[in-house]
Amino acid sequence: MFSEKANTIFQDVIKTYKVLNTVDQPFTNKYNKSDDLIAHLLYRKSWIDTVQWAYEDIIRDPNIDPVAALKLKRKIDASNQDRTDTVEFIDSYFLDKYKDVAAKANAKINSESPAWVIDRLSILALKIYHMHLETVRADASDAHKAACQTKLNVLLEQREDLSTAIDDLLTDISNGDKYMKVYKQMKMYNDDELNPVLRGQK
């Protein structure tokens, strides 16, 4: 199933990132886009999410230098744009894959495109990884670890449900029971024609 492939890639990305565990490390995609385009895109998507998770931790440091915080905020904005672009590339992959499928007369549209469901699955992998760390943290109290284990159990159940949902959605699209319709996110904050502050600097 697709979800099994995606979840395996997401876990591998996190494991690979944590070897050096720094936002400044170089990125190397383990998958060639000519050989396995969707794996290439999933790996890239998960890497963006993993680095941004670290960015969000760093910027919440109450002692962070304001200049460094501003620089990091710009990196987060760029990362968000990269994330959105990659999600749209993933949807383009599925649009192309299913372009010859004739939607049935009673076919319905899903509230989310496949790629945005995959986006949530990628973020969920990070939540599960970090919540698991809290359940085995040596300096944490038993109460803390127990509370985190309860949360982890919910996250694991959520991953199971979300994995089933994306597999069912792709099956429905491939059978013509549902059809894809993708809207670009139209993010405005990085566009110097749409952000009034940036526009005023031109």
Kindly label every feature range from the protein language model.
Residues 1-202:
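Anionic, Ser/Thr-rich low-complexity intrinsically disordered regions
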